[in-house]
UniProtKB/Swiss-Prot annotation:
Protein known as: Probable malate:quinone oxidoreductase
Pathway involvement of the protein, from the record: Carbohydrate metabolism; tricarboxylic acid cycle; oxaloacetate from (S)-malate (quinone route): step 1/1
GO BP annotations listed: tricarboxylic acid cycle
Record field: catalytic activity: (S)-malate + a quinone = a quinol + oxaloacetate
Pfam families to which the protein is assigned, alphabetical: Mqo
Entry keyword annotation includes Lyase: no
Similarity remark: Belongs to the MQO family.
GO molecular function: 2-hydroxyglutarate dehydrogenase activity; L-malate dehydrogenase (quinone) activity
HAMAP family linked: MQO
Gene name, Swiss-Prot/TrEMBL: mqo
NCBIfam families assigned to the protein according to its UniProt record, in alphabetical order: mal_quin_oxido, PRK05257.1-1, PRK05257.1-4, PRK05257.2-1, PRK05257.2-5, PRK05257.3-1, PRK05257.3-2, PRK13339.1
Amino acid sequence: MPTTSSTATHDVVLIGGGIMSATLGVLLQKLEPTWSIALYENLDQAGLESSDPWNNAGTGHAALCELNYSPMDKNGRVDVTKALGINEQFWITRQFWSSLVVDGTLKDPKSFINPLPHMSFVWGDDHADYLRARYEAMSAQPVFAGMEHSEDPEQIRAWAPLLIEGRESGQRLAASRHTGGTDVDFGSLTRQLVTAMAGAGAEVRFGHKVTGLTRGTDGRWEVKVKNKAAGSEVVDRARFVFVGAGGGALPLLQKSGIPEIKGFGGFPVSGQFLRCTDESVVNQHMAKVYGQAAVGAPPMSVPHLDTRFVNGKRSLLFGPYAGFSTNFLKTGSYLDLPLSVRPHNLTTMLDVAKDNVDLTKYLVTEVLKSRDKKIDALHEFYPEADGGEWELITAGQRVQVMKRKGRFGGVLQFGTEVVTHADGSLGGLLGASPGASTAAPIMVKLLERCFPAKTAGWDGTLKELIPSLGHTLNDDPALLDEVRTVTDAALKLA
């Protein structure tokens, strides 16, 4: 058994080397450059779990094409409230990245973000009617101005020829398109942010697994960390801890013993994609094209055919195909889910199971799908696809939040959930999509909750980094145009 060989003391400890910890670390260095920061990551590099480009779809989620963010209500009206919120969040993230490029923290923006049209594509009368109504509702909003819509197959062919080639005529098709979308390599971005953190004085440790998180008698958090290569342990005593360990955040927050984590559970959903690198195919498609989710499918399982830019190379991705695994991390253990069950979240989890029979059936069906069935799903988007040109890859784990509702009930929540201790000394993030795209606003929100006495003093620096902070761009078209112009130039998107 390894023994504790040393102790360390830091103002801030970040657990996990993904996009959230990286974003928070850089933010804190801008706001409090004298604070000491340590980051511990279990794997050998930053951004290898959920942030890795092949473990997610790389969509800069701005609600331009994702139909689940703009549902139709019971009165037949498309509700764009959630879409507006997500779009505003991505503008905050874009401004943050732009400021980091301008000040030299990030180097070549092309290494992590590229302009790419975002499209929605459906077929059948009901779906086409919905997409028309969505287009009318969305295009009336300043942040979505410039959206195009067509039911003409030839126009859709001009936008994305693979969708039309070989498709039977007579089927009603509809597509909406916005040229302001992006593809993001969150793995590359994360690694650049962590490198910048280390260069600014943060202590970054890879191959270090956090095994314990308890409160010391003096109020500091004692973070027990195992050096996997050396077999030694260190206890890092920190004033503030952020648990940004992706799917691994729930077990660590449970170990902390904070009352705010009571009632929370995790529902892991695995995923696979089909990937094509054949240039003769890849060069015919330049868009992210999102469709409608199947009945009972979770939002992260909306099918989409995407252009990807990874390590300077273009490829296509189709999926995701959802599945179920009890791992909370791709590199985790099958015991992750059962070991997360506690008396305080058991009723939450049972109630969620009872109310989500359709989801369970859907996941079982997806798990049992053969490769041929997966190719059949691809053919619905790309009729002439040759299955031999596509390889099946396993994506990252998405641990959806199960949250207490009432005294004994529970609800399955899609999205992210910030959990903080009452005294602000500990914060963590649960959940998944849109996740990475909203890293900057989520981390700003976490800072406001954990350091309320500091926020007034930080306001000036935050507004230098994110000029629109505190404003709603959709209500201020002039500011929106200014932010778009500045960020397009800095990120080389124009």
